[in-house]
């Protein structure tokens, strides 16, 4: 019987153990999509205590606490950091079977070095003091943790109107060797149905010094901001798409009319929203191809389901879930609009509903080519699939329907500096899966064949994919 969270955690066979310890463990982290605050990296934030670094903005933990009956004051309210932390300590023993239990103890082990205690109300006070002492040292600032965890690149998520001043400051600081690069998140520019759309057009126009009245004005403003992002090292875009919309692109005059009507406050039809969204996203995708960027499409979240809590806390507070609207037809046509002129960029497709895994794994095969290995990717298990079964299912289905060997691997998609252990979690699951194949005779038990593939999936593929610009 294995001990909990031992050195061979999740590694069920000898080949898996060798793959992990000899090939995966020491690989750097290329965290190409996250939600870290770049200001906290630029300013090298020193966290006051463990509760602050652990619980601020972490809606995964917040959902668990609510399910455990913790009152909202101790989750997002005005309670002290210590009281919120103790509420989390009360919750953790109830999360057995949930990845939160694994993540919590992995985060205590790395970077804090705590391996001799299970987190609970009984151990929480000792762990609080032990971790707070470490958090007061230079090795446990925002930058210190990134360096401890062997991060070489972090791709943040940024709005086209952002100044990118913090990315600039980080890039100009020779004392810090981690790349922190912006990623372009243009959702508000193509979701014409949003209540904030008109206000956003005004803000975008101000930043770009262009009055946005016609469709071409919008494209010109976006183009200026694309150049700004590219100059600051951006190599990726990310579109959050709750519902994939596609409609044949109308004439520019019709798009001008749609934009004018929306800016005047008129509500557009579903078809008109789809026409506008398609036109903007296809134009953006072609520009990404010209710039050598990667386009990421995160598809299928059903957001802000609780009106009451949305009004109280706003978005990204733990009230989102998996959507179930089919989208294969629309997605294929959206990608094809770019591919018809050979202007589809490198693209990563993520689905939130695991029902769509096989569809996505086959969809990527429709648009490969151009001499680019793995040009179109089926992204790692996202959000609610960011757990043992979800990641394993995604990789197994990719291997059966595509090429696992070309997979760009894991990303944290997180707001927390302690989430880098999710790369360790992923690597252990990957090595166990490949090791089982070898032990069962499904692939050769040859580490000279399997080891380099594991190394590439952990790091090499992502580095090449995001840094090649052809």
Curated annotation (Swiss-Prot):
One Pfam family linked to the record: UxaC
A Gene Ontology BP annotation from the UniProt entry: D-galacturonate catabolic process
Catalytic activity entry: D-glucuronate = D-fructuronate; aldehydo-D-galacturonate = keto-D-tagaturonate
Class in the EC hierarchy, top level: isomerase
Keyword Isomerase on entry: yes
Residues in coiled coil: none
Gene Ontology molecular function: glucuronate isomerase activity
Pathways involved: Carbohydrate metabolism; pentose and glucuronate interconversion
EC id: 5.3.1.12
UniProt keyword terms in alphabetical order: Isomerase
Keyword match Isomerase: yes
Family note: Belongs to the metallo-dependent hydrolases superfamily. Uronate isomerase family.
Protein name: Uronate isomerase
């Amino acid at each position: 019987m294995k001990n909990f969270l031992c050195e061979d955690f999740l590694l069920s066979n000898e080949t898996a153990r060798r793959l992990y310890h000899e090939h995966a463990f020491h690989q750097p982290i290329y965290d190409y999509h996250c939600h870290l605050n770049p200001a906290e990296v630029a300013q090298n934030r020193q966290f006051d205590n463990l509760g602050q670094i652990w619980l601020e903005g972490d809606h995964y933990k917040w959902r668990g606490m609510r399910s455990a009956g913790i009152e909202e004051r101790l989750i997002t309210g005005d309670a002290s950091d210590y009281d919120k932390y103790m509420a989390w300590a009360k919750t953790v023993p109830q999360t057995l079977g949930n990845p939160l239990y694994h993540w919590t103890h992995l985060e205590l082990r790395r970077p804090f070095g705590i391996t001799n205690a299970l987190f609970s109300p009984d151990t929480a006070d000792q762990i609080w003091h032990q971790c707070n002492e470490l958090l007061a040292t230079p090795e446990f600032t925002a930058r210190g943790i990134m360096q401890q965890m062997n991060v070489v690149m972090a791709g943040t998520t940024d709005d086209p109107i952002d100044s990118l001043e913090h990315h600039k400051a980080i890039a100009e600081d020779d004392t810090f060797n981690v790349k922190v690069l912006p990623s372009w998140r243009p959702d508000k520019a193509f979701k014409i149905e949003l209540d904030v759309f008109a206000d956003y057009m005004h803000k975008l126009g101000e930043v770009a010094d262009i009055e946005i009245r016609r469709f071409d004005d919008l494209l010109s403003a976006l183009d200026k901001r694309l150049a700004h992002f590219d100059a600051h090292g951006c190599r990726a875009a990310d579109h959050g798409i709750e519902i994939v919309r596609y409609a044949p692109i109308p004439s520019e005059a019709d798009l001008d009319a749609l934009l004018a009507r929306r800016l005047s406050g008129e509500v557009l039809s579903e078809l008109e929203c789809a026409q506008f969204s398609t036109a903007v996203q296809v134009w953006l995708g072609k520009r990404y191809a010209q710039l050598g960027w990667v386009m990421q499409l995160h598809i299928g979240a059903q957001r802000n389901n609780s009106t009451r809590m949305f009004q109280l806390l706003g978005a990204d507070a733990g009230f989102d879930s998996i959507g179930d609207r089919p989208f294969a037809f629309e997605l294929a046509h959206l990608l094809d609009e770019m591919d018809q002129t050979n202007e589809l960029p490198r693209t990563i497709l993520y689905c939130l509903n695991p029902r769509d895994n096989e569809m996505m794994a086959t969809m990527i095969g429709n648009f490969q080519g151009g001499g680019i290995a793995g040009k179109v990717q089926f992204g790692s298990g996202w959000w609610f699939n960011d757990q043992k079964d979800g990641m394993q299912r995604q990789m197994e289905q990719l291997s059966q329907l595509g090429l696992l060997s070309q997979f760009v691997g894991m990303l944290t998609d997180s707001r927390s500096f302690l989430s880098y252990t999710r790369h360790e979690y992923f690597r252990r699951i990957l090595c166990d899966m490949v090791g089982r194949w070898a032990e069962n005779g499904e692939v050769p038990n040859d580490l000279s064949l399997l080891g380099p593939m594991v190394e590439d999936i952990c790091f090499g593929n992502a580095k090449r994919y995001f840094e090649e610009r052809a």
